[in-house]
Swiss-Prot record:
This is Patatin-12. A motif (GXGXXG) lies at residues 36-41. The lineage of its organism: Eukaryota, Viridiplantae, Streptophyta, Embryophyta, Tracheophyta. Its main location: other. Its EC number is 3.1.1.-. It is found in: Vacuole.
Protein backbone atom coordinates (compact mmCIF):
# COMPACT_ATOMS: atom_id res chain seq x y z
CA UNK A 1 0.00 0.00 0.00
CA UNK A 2 2.82 2.37 0.90
CA UNK A 3 4.53 1.51 -2.36
CA UNK A 4 1.36 2.25 -4.34
CA UNK A 5 0.90 5.55 -2.53
CA UNK A 6 4.50 6.55 -3.22
CA UNK A 7 4.05 5.62 -6.87
CA UNK A 8 0.92 7.78 -7.14
CA UNK A 9 2.72 10.70 -5.52
CA UNK A 10 5.57 10.29 -8.00
CA UNK A 11 3.12 10.28 -10.94
CA UNK A 12 1.45 13.45 -9.65
CA UNK A 13 4.84 15.13 -9.29
CA UNK A 14 5.82 14.16 -12.84
CA UNK A 15 2.52 15.42 -14.25
CA UNK A 16 2.86 18.67 -12.32
CA UNK A 17 6.40 19.14 -13.58
CA UNK A 18 5.37 18.35 -17.16
CA UNK A 19 2.43 20.75 -16.94
CA UNK A 20 4.73 23.44 -15.55
CA UNK A 21 7.22 22.82 -18.36
CA UNK A 22 4.51 23.21 -21.02
CA UNK A 23 3.19 26.36 -19.35
CA UNK A 24 6.71 27.73 -19.16
CA UNK A 25 7.35 27.02 -22.84
CA UNK A 26 4.02 28.48 -23.90
CA UNK A 27 4.72 31.77 -22.13
CA UNK A 28 8.35 32.03 -23.21
CA UNK A 29 9.26 35.32 -24.93
CA UNK A 30 11.18 34.62 -28.12
CA UNK A 31 13.63 37.15 -29.55
CA UNK A 32 15.61 37.34 -32.80
CA UNK A 33 18.37 39.95 -33.14
CA UNK A 34 20.31 40.66 -36.35
CA UNK A 35 23.53 42.69 -36.52
CA UNK A 36 24.48 45.35 -39.02
CA UNK A 37 27.20 44.87 -41.60
CA UNK A 38 26.18 45.88 -45.12
CA UNK A 39 26.54 43.15 -47.72
CA UNK A 40 27.69 40.83 -44.93
CA UNK A 41 24.00 40.46 -44.12
CA UNK A 42 24.31 37.45 -46.42
CA UNK A 43 25.82 35.56 -43.47
CA UNK A 44 22.80 35.86 -41.12
CA UNK A 45 20.62 35.47 -44.20
CA UNK A 46 22.16 32.05 -44.75
CA UNK A 47 21.61 31.14 -41.09
CA UNK A 48 17.97 32.27 -41.25
CA UNK A 49 17.42 30.21 -44.38
CA UNK A 50 18.50 27.12 -42.45
CA UNK A 51 16.34 28.00 -39.44
CA UNK A 52 13.32 28.79 -41.60
CA UNK A 53 13.69 25.48 -43.40
CA UNK A 54 13.83 23.59 -40.10
CA UNK A 55 10.65 25.29 -38.86
CA UNK A 56 8.79 24.50 -42.07
CA UNK A 57 9.92 20.88 -41.85
CA UNK A 58 8.98 20.47 -38.18
CA UNK A 59 5.55 22.00 -38.67
CA UNK A 60 5.01 20.43 -42.10
CA UNK A 61 4.02 23.87 -43.36
CA UNK A 62 5.67 25.46 -46.39
CA UNK A 63 3.97 28.76 -45.52
CA UNK A 64 5.59 28.98 -42.06
CA UNK A 65 7.49 32.24 -41.63
CA UNK A 66 9.95 33.48 -39.02
CA UNK A 67 7.53 36.17 -37.83
CA UNK A 68 5.15 33.38 -36.76
CA UNK A 69 7.65 32.22 -34.14
CA UNK A 70 9.34 35.31 -32.68
CA UNK A 71 7.69 37.82 -30.34
CA UNK A 72 10.40 40.41 -31.02
CA UNK A 73 12.63 40.77 -34.08
CA UNK A 74 15.26 43.49 -33.89
CA UNK A 75 17.98 44.69 -36.19
CA UNK A 76 20.27 47.52 -37.06
CA UNK A 77 21.64 48.62 -40.43
CA UNK A 78 21.43 45.61 -42.76
CA UNK A 79 19.88 43.72 -39.82
CA UNK A 80 17.13 46.34 -39.75
CA UNK A 81 16.51 45.69 -43.43
CA UNK A 82 16.25 41.95 -42.75
CA UNK A 83 13.88 42.67 -39.87
CA UNK A 84 11.59 44.60 -42.21
CA UNK A 85 11.77 41.93 -44.90
CA UNK A 86 10.55 39.17 -42.59
CA UNK A 87 7.94 41.21 -40.68
CA UNK A 88 6.39 43.56 -43.25
CA UNK A 89 3.09 42.16 -44.59
CA UNK A 90 2.28 41.64 -48.25
CA UNK A 91 -1.19 41.83 -49.79
CA UNK A 92 -2.07 38.52 -48.10
CA UNK A 93 -0.95 39.79 -44.69
CA UNK A 94 2.03 37.44 -44.70
CA UNK A 95 5.71 38.50 -44.60
CA UNK A 96 6.75 39.66 -48.05
CA UNK A 97 9.98 37.66 -47.79
CA UNK A 98 10.49 34.08 -46.68
CA UNK A 99 13.77 33.08 -45.05
CA UNK A 100 15.03 31.49 -48.27
CA UNK A 101 14.46 34.74 -50.19
CA UNK A 102 16.89 36.84 -48.16
CA UNK A 103 20.16 35.77 -49.79
CA UNK A 104 18.73 36.05 -53.34
CA UNK A 105 17.67 39.61 -52.44
CA UNK A 106 21.29 40.53 -51.73
CA UNK A 107 22.51 38.89 -54.93
CA UNK A 108 19.92 40.73 -57.01
CA UNK A 109 20.13 44.18 -55.45
CA UNK A 110 23.48 44.33 -53.65
CA UNK A 111 25.57 45.11 -56.77
CA UNK A 112 23.25 48.04 -57.59
CA UNK A 113 23.06 49.37 -54.03
CA UNK A 114 26.85 49.41 -53.75
CA UNK A 115 27.55 50.58 -57.30
CA UNK A 116 26.02 54.05 -57.43
CA UNK A 117 29.20 55.81 -56.32
CA UNK A 118 28.97 59.58 -56.05
CA UNK A 119 32.56 59.95 -57.17
CA UNK A 120 33.02 62.66 -54.55
CA UNK A 121 35.93 62.71 -52.14
CA UNK A 122 34.07 64.95 -49.71
CA UNK A 123 30.75 63.18 -49.38
CA UNK A 124 29.20 59.73 -49.00
CA UNK A 125 30.62 56.91 -51.08
CA UNK A 126 27.21 55.99 -52.53
CA UNK A 127 24.21 58.16 -53.37
CA UNK A 128 21.64 55.77 -51.87
CA UNK A 129 19.12 56.31 -54.68
CA UNK A 130 18.87 52.68 -55.71
CA UNK A 131 18.59 51.58 -52.07
CA UNK A 132 15.66 53.93 -51.52
CA UNK A 133 14.08 52.84 -54.80
CA UNK A 134 14.12 49.15 -53.96
CA UNK A 135 12.91 49.78 -50.39
CA UNK A 136 9.92 51.77 -51.65
CA UNK A 137 9.18 49.09 -54.22
CA UNK A 138 9.32 46.22 -51.72
CA UNK A 139 7.84 47.85 -48.61
CA UNK A 140 5.31 50.20 -50.17
CA UNK A 141 3.39 52.46 -47.78
CA UNK A 142 3.55 50.01 -44.87
CA UNK A 143 4.11 51.57 -41.45
CA UNK A 144 5.47 50.27 -38.17
CA UNK A 145 2.08 49.43 -36.67
CA UNK A 146 1.43 46.97 -39.49
CA UNK A 147 4.45 44.77 -38.72
CA UNK A 148 3.41 41.17 -38.13
CA UNK A 149 5.27 40.95 -34.83
CA UNK A 150 7.02 43.39 -32.49
CA UNK A 151 10.05 44.99 -34.12
CA UNK A 152 13.01 46.95 -32.77
CA UNK A 153 14.89 48.88 -35.45
CA UNK A 154 17.44 51.45 -34.37
CA UNK A 155 18.67 54.67 -35.93
CA UNK A 156 20.35 57.84 -34.69
CA UNK A 157 19.08 61.41 -35.04
CA UNK A 158 22.02 63.72 -35.73
CA UNK A 159 19.94 66.84 -35.02
CA UNK A 160 18.74 65.83 -31.55
CA UNK A 161 21.86 63.73 -30.92
CA UNK A 162 19.74 60.85 -29.63
CA UNK A 163 19.04 57.27 -30.71
CA UNK A 164 15.64 56.59 -32.24
CA UNK A 165 14.10 53.17 -31.70
CA UNK A 166 11.17 52.16 -33.89
CA UNK A 167 8.90 49.64 -32.13
CA UNK A 168 5.19 48.92 -32.24
CA UNK A 169 4.90 49.09 -28.47
CA UNK A 170 6.11 52.71 -28.41
CA UNK A 171 3.40 54.01 -30.73
CA UNK A 172 0.74 54.66 -28.09
CA UNK A 173 3.06 57.10 -26.30
CA UNK A 174 4.91 58.32 -29.40
CA UNK A 175 2.67 58.10 -32.50
CA UNK A 176 5.24 60.08 -34.49
CA UNK A 177 7.32 56.88 -34.55
CA UNK A 178 4.75 55.20 -36.80
CA UNK A 179 6.88 55.95 -39.84
CA UNK A 180 6.89 54.23 -43.20
CA UNK A 181 9.03 51.14 -43.20
CA UNK A 182 11.07 52.24 -46.20
CA UNK A 183 12.04 55.46 -44.39
CA UNK A 184 13.07 53.44 -41.34
CA UNK A 185 15.04 50.89 -43.36
CA UNK A 186 16.95 53.52 -45.30
CA UNK A 187 17.69 55.40 -42.08
CA UNK A 188 19.04 52.40 -40.19
CA UNK A 189 21.22 51.54 -43.21
CA UNK A 190 22.52 55.08 -43.81
CA UNK A 191 26.01 54.36 -42.55
CA UNK A 192 28.21 57.47 -42.31
CA UNK A 193 30.77 57.56 -45.13
CA UNK A 194 28.70 55.10 -47.20
CA UNK A 195 25.23 56.69 -47.59
CA UNK A 196 23.70 60.16 -47.09
CA UNK A 197 21.67 60.76 -43.90
CA UNK A 198 17.91 60.56 -44.31
CA UNK A 199 15.40 63.34 -43.64
CA UNK A 200 11.67 62.71 -43.42
CA UNK A 201 8.66 63.86 -41.43
CA UNK A 202 5.73 62.28 -39.61
CA UNK A 203 3.07 63.83 -37.40
CA UNK A 204 2.46 63.92 -33.67
CA UNK A 205 -0.88 63.11 -32.02
CA UNK A 206 -1.67 66.84 -32.23
CA UNK A 207 -1.03 66.89 -35.96
CA UNK A 208 2.24 68.79 -35.63
CA UNK A 209 5.09 68.00 -37.98
CA UNK A 210 7.82 65.83 -36.48
CA UNK A 211 11.21 65.84 -38.18
CA UNK A 212 13.76 63.07 -38.38
CA UNK A 213 17.41 63.50 -39.41
CA UNK A 214 18.69 59.96 -39.22
CA UNK A 215 21.81 57.91 -39.84
CA UNK A 216 22.81 54.27 -39.45
CA UNK A 217 21.40 52.45 -36.42
CA UNK A 218 24.89 51.17 -35.74
CA UNK A 219 25.70 54.61 -34.34
CA UNK A 220 23.09 53.92 -31.64
CA UNK A 221 23.71 50.22 -31.01
CA UNK A 222 27.25 49.98 -32.46
CA UNK A 223 26.25 47.16 -34.78
CA UNK A 224 24.83 44.64 -32.31
CA UNK A 225 21.16 45.22 -31.39
CA UNK A 226 20.85 42.20 -29.08
CA UNK A 227 20.67 44.27 -25.88
CA UNK A 228 18.12 46.57 -27.49
CA UNK A 229 16.00 43.62 -28.63
CA UNK A 230 16.24 42.03 -25.20
CA UNK A 231 15.13 45.24 -23.48
CA UNK A 232 12.10 45.50 -25.79
CA UNK A 233 11.27 41.86 -25.02
CA UNK A 234 11.56 42.53 -21.29
CA UNK A 235 9.13 45.42 -21.56
CA UNK A 236 6.79 43.27 -23.65
CA UNK A 237 6.83 40.58 -20.96
CA UNK A 238 5.89 43.17 -18.34
CA UNK A 239 3.09 44.83 -20.33
CA UNK A 240 1.48 42.03 -22.37
CA UNK A 241 -1.10 39.98 -20.39
CA UNK A 242 -0.06 36.89 -22.37
CA UNK A 243 3.17 36.89 -20.36
CA UNK A 244 1.67 37.80 -16.99
CA UNK A 245 3.35 34.91 -15.18
CA UNK A 246 6.86 36.02 -16.16
CA UNK A 247 8.74 37.74 -13.39
CA UNK A 248 10.97 40.72 -14.08
CA UNK A 249 14.33 39.68 -15.56
CA UNK A 250 13.33 36.00 -15.57
CA UNK A 251 15.70 34.87 -18.32
CA UNK A 252 14.47 31.30 -18.04
CA UNK A 253 11.44 32.62 -19.88
CA UNK A 254 13.48 34.35 -22.58
CA UNK A 255 14.79 32.70 -25.74
CA UNK A 256 17.31 34.90 -27.57
CA UNK A 257 18.87 34.14 -30.94
CA UNK A 258 21.49 36.73 -31.93
CA UNK A 259 22.97 36.64 -35.43
CA UNK A 260 26.22 38.40 -36.31
CA UNK A 261 27.53 39.44 -39.71
CA UNK A 262 31.06 38.29 -38.98
CA UNK A 263 34.16 40.08 -37.83
CA UNK A 264 37.92 39.66 -37.72
CA UNK A 265 38.95 39.28 -34.10
CA UNK A 266 42.66 39.02 -34.86
CA UNK A 267 43.39 42.72 -35.07
CA UNK A 268 47.04 42.09 -34.32
CA UNK A 269 47.26 40.27 -37.65
CA UNK A 270 45.73 43.20 -39.49
CA UNK A 271 47.11 46.26 -37.71
CA UNK A 272 50.17 46.93 -35.61
CA UNK A 273 50.96 49.88 -33.38
CA UNK A 274 53.86 50.78 -35.67
CA UNK A 275 51.56 50.80 -38.70
CA UNK A 276 48.74 52.72 -37.01
CA UNK A 277 51.18 55.35 -35.75
CA UNK A 278 51.49 56.55 -39.34
CA UNK A 279 47.75 56.84 -39.99
CA UNK A 280 46.00 60.12 -40.65
CA UNK A 281 42.37 61.03 -39.76
CA UNK A 282 40.84 59.36 -42.84
CA UNK A 283 42.60 56.04 -42.27
CA UNK A 284 41.57 56.06 -38.64
CA UNK A 285 37.95 56.78 -39.59
CA UNK A 286 37.85 53.65 -41.72
CA UNK A 287 39.57 51.43 -39.14
CA UNK A 288 37.87 52.69 -36.01
CA UNK A 289 34.41 51.67 -37.21
CA UNK A 290 35.55 48.10 -37.76
CA UNK A 291 37.28 48.00 -34.38
CA UNK A 292 34.35 49.56 -32.54
CA UNK A 293 31.81 47.22 -34.12
CA UNK A 294 33.88 44.17 -33.23
CA UNK A 295 34.58 45.31 -29.67
CA UNK A 296 30.94 46.23 -28.99
CA UNK A 297 29.79 42.91 -30.40
CA UNK A 298 32.08 41.02 -28.02
CA UNK A 299 31.03 43.12 -25.05
CA UNK A 300 27.31 42.71 -25.78
CA UNK A 301 27.78 38.96 -26.13
CA UNK A 302 29.85 38.85 -22.94
CA UNK A 303 27.25 40.78 -20.96
CA UNK A 304 24.28 38.77 -22.22
CA UNK A 305 26.09 35.45 -21.74
CA UNK A 306 27.01 36.41 -18.19
CA UNK A 307 23.44 37.39 -17.32
CA UNK A 308 21.90 34.25 -18.79
CA UNK A 309 24.48 32.05 -17.05
CA UNK A 310 23.89 33.80 -13.74
CA UNK A 311 20.19 32.96 -14.12
CA UNK A 312 21.01 29.35 -15.05
CA UNK A 313 19.51 29.96 -18.49
CA UNK A 314 22.59 29.72 -20.70
CA UNK A 315 20.83 27.32 -23.09
CA UNK A 316 18.27 30.04 -23.83
CA UNK A 317 20.83 32.28 -25.53
CA UNK A 318 22.60 31.53 -28.79
CA UNK A 319 25.03 33.91 -30.46
CA UNK A 320 25.87 32.85 -34.03
CA UNK A 321 28.99 34.69 -35.15
CA UNK A 322 32.00 34.09 -37.37
CA UNK A 323 35.05 35.69 -35.76
CA UNK A 324 37.65 34.92 -38.39
CA UNK A 325 36.66 36.72 -41.58
CA UNK A 326 39.51 37.39 -43.99
CA UNK A 327 40.11 39.21 -47.24
CA UNK A 328 37.14 40.72 -49.08
CA UNK A 329 34.60 39.12 -46.74
CA UNK A 330 35.48 41.74 -44.11
CA UNK A 331 34.25 44.55 -46.37
CA UNK A 332 30.77 45.98 -45.84
CA UNK A 333 30.32 47.03 -49.47
CA UNK A 334 32.01 44.43 -51.67
CA UNK A 335 28.97 43.22 -53.60
CA UNK A 336 30.89 41.40 -56.30
CA UNK A 337 29.41 38.01 -57.12
CA UNK A 338 32.63 36.30 -56.07
CA UNK A 339 32.57 37.91 -52.62
CA UNK A 340 28.86 37.26 -52.10
CA UNK A 341 29.46 33.59 -52.91
CA UNK A 342 32.24 33.60 -50.30
CA UNK A 343 29.85 35.08 -47.72
CA UNK A 344 27.36 32.30 -48.40
CA UNK A 345 30.16 29.79 -47.86
CA UNK A 346 31.05 31.52 -44.58
CA UNK A 347 27.47 31.06 -43.37
CA UNK A 348 27.26 27.45 -44.49
CA UNK A 349 30.62 26.59 -42.93
CA UNK A 350 29.66 28.35 -39.71
CA UNK A 351 26.71 26.00 -39.30
CA UNK A 352 29.13 23.09 -39.02
CA UNK A 353 31.37 24.75 -36.42
CA UNK A 354 31.07 24.14 -32.65
CA UNK A 355 29.23 26.79 -30.66
CA UNK A 356 32.14 27.01 -28.23
CA UNK A 357 35.42 25.32 -27.37
CA UNK A 358 33.77 23.72 -24.36
CA UNK A 359 30.84 22.18 -26.25
CA UNK A 360 30.74 19.71 -29.13
CA UNK A 361 27.32 21.07 -30.18
CA UNK A 362 27.50 22.71 -33.61
CA UNK A 363 25.57 25.82 -34.60
CA UNK A 364 23.45 23.62 -36.84
CA UNK A 365 22.53 21.39 -33.91
CA UNK A 366 21.89 24.39 -31.64
CA UNK A 367 19.61 25.96 -34.25
CA UNK A 368 17.69 22.70 -34.57
CA UNK A 369 17.26 22.74 -30.79
CA UNK A 370 15.99 26.32 -30.94
CA UNK A 371 13.69 25.43 -33.85
CA UNK A 372 12.17 22.60 -31.80
CA UNK A 373 11.45 24.98 -28.92
CA UNK A 374 9.96 27.56 -31.28
CA UNK A 375 7.82 24.95 -33.01
CA UNK A 376 6.57 23.39 -29.77
CA UNK A 377 5.76 26.77 -28.29
CA UNK A 378 3.78 27.80 -31.36
CA UNK A 379 1.76 24.58 -31.22
CA UNK A 380 1.01 25.05 -27.52
CA UNK A 381 -0.21 28.58 -28.13
CA UNK A 382 -2.33 27.45 -31.07
CA UNK A 383 -3.92 24.71 -28.96
CA UNK A 384 -4.69 27.17 -26.17
CA UNK A 385 -6.25 29.64 -28.61
CA UNK A 386 -8.53 26.93 -30.02
CA UNK A 387 -10.25 26.37 -26.66
Amino acid sequence: MATTKSFLILIVMILATTSSTFASLEEMVTVLSIDGGGIKGIIPGTILEFLGGQLQKMDNNADARLADYFDVIGGTSTGGLLTAMITTPNENNRPFAAANEIVPFYFEHGPHIFNSSTGQFFGPKYDGKYLMQVLQEKLGETRVHQALTEVAISSFDIKTNKPVIFTKSNLAKSPELDAKMYDICYSTAAAPIYFPPHYFITHTSNGDIYEFNLVDGGVATVGDPALLSLSVATRLAQEDPAFSSIKSLDYKQMLLLSLGTGTNSEFDKTYTAQEAAKWGPLRWMLAIRQMTNAASSYMADYYISTVFQARHSQNNYLRVQENALTGTTTEMDDASEANMELLVQVGETLLKKPVSKDSPETYEEALKRFAKLLSDRKKLRANKASY
